[in-house]
Amino acid sequence: MKAFMDKDFLLETPTAQHLYHDYAETLPIVDYHCHIPPQEIYEDRRFENIAQVWLGGHQVLADGSDYYFGDHYKWRVMRSNGVPEEYITGDKPDRERFQKFAEALGMAIGNPMYTWCHLELKKYFGYNGVLNGDTAEEVWNLCNDKLQHDPKMTVRGLIEQSNVAMVGTTDDPIDSLEWHKKIKEDPTIKVVVAPSFRPDKALNIRKDGFADYIHKLEEVVGRKFACANCVVNALEERLQFFVEMGCRASDHGLDYVPYVETNAEKATAAFKKAMAGEPLTQEEGDAYTTYLLISLGRLYKKYNVAMQIHYSCLRNVNQKMYKKLGPDTGFDMIAVTDGSAAISSLLSKLTETGECPKVILYSLNPADFDMLGTILGAFQDDEVPGKIQLGSAWWFCDTDDGMYQQMKTLARLGLLGNFIGMLTDSRSFLSYTRHELFRRLMCNLIGNWVENGQYPSDEKTLKKIVEGISYYNAQRYFHL
C-alpha cells in the first residue's frame, strides 16, 4: 500500500517521477484566470483563521444588501453532507463552521476537494495528517497559529512561496482598477497582477439589469449611447485602459455561445428595445450579442488580448437559494448546449478579415471536448504556437478524470505540447496547489506513454514538453 499523498503521489512510474521532480515541480506559476480580489494583494491581508480562508463568509454592503463570498466548491460539499445553511453562509462561529466542513470532508472520498485541502495543509501548514471531524481541533489550532504569526502567511507571502509569476484577475470594464494601479506602482510587489476584461454585463442584453449597467458604463465614459456601436466604442475605450494597466486576456462567461447573421442595424434595434424596457426575443438578443462578440474579437486582436470563452453553464438553478444568497454561491450546473456551429462561425467570421485573436475555449460539459478539439485545428495560424486553445478542465471538470480527459483529447486532436496549462479559477490564495496536482497528472500521463513505448524516452523533447505545459507556453502566450 502506498503512503497517503507522499512525494510521488499520483506519479505511477519512474519516468513520471523524474519528469515531475526534475522539470515540472519548481517552475513558476502563471495563474492566468482567477477570481481573487486585487485589493487583498495590495493590502497584504492576513487572515485570522482557516475558516476565513477556506469558507469565506457574509458581509453587508454599503447599500444594505447582503454579499456572500467564499469557496462554493466547499459549500456544496457541506450541503451534500446535510449541514444547515447557517454553518455555510450564515453567521455561526468560524470554529463551528470549520468543524462542520471537516466532518463533511471526511466523507468526500474521490472528490477533488479532498485532494486540494490536503495538498494545501501539507504545503502551507506543514500538516501531513488527515483532516476529519476528529482532527478538526488540531488542524484548527495549527493553521490559525501560522496564519496569525508566520510572516510568510500573508496574502503576498502565500503568493511568493507559491512561486506565482502572474495573477490574472477577473474585472468588469467599469472597474477603476485602482488596486491594480497601486500594485503596479509598488516596487515591493514582484508578481504581475494583470486585470482581465470581462464585459458580460454589456453583452447579456436579455438579463435583468442590462439597462442599469449600460447607464453605469455611460457614466464611466462620459457620454450617452444611441446605438450598439456606441457600446462597442465605449468598451474599446475601457479595453485600452485595461491594456495600459497590463491586461493580457478577456473573458466571456456565456450560458451558450450565440451566432446569428447580424449587423449594426439589427444590433442597434435590439439595444434600443432593451433600453426602453421592452422584452426581446432570443433571436433579437442573439443578434446583439453576436455583433458584440465579433466586434470585441476584432478589438482583442488589435490590442493583443487573448479571448477566453467559458460556456455551457446553467446558473442559479435553485431559485429559492439564489433569491436568498445571490449568484456564485453553489447553485449552478452543467448545461447541454451545442456550440459547434456558433463557435466555428464566430472564429470563421473573425478569420475572414485576419482579425481572429488568440482564443481559449472552455466548455463546462466534457462531452464538448472532442468537438472543441477539432475546432482548434481548423483555425490555427502562425501568430503563436497553439493560438486557439482547448481550455483547461474547468469547474466541475476540474478533477483527475476531467484533466486526463482534457489532455488526452488535446493530444489526440491537436498538440498537447503547446498547451498553456493550468489555472485555478479560484477565490482562494491557497489554491495554487491545484497547479501542483495538474503537473503531477500531466507528468503521470506523459510518463505512462513513455513507459508503454508509445513515445520515445527522448530527454530533450520530454523536458521541453513538460516545462512548456507547466510554464513556458503560458509565458509566451501572455507575453510575460
State what each model feature region is:
Residues 307-309:
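C-terminal amphipathic alpha-helical interaction region
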Residues 339-343:
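Divalent-cation-assisted or electrostatically stabilized phosphate/pyrophosphate-binding catalytic cores
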Residues 322-334:
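Active-site loop ensemble at the mouth of alpha/beta enzyme cores that anchors a bound cofactor
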Residues 281-282, 331-337:
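A short acidic, glycine-rich active-site loop
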Residues 2-303, 355-357, 361-373, 377-480:
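Metal-cofactor-binding active-site regions of metalloenzymes
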Residues 346-352:
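Short, basic/hydrophobic alpha-helical segments
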Residues 318:
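Hard-cation-handling environments
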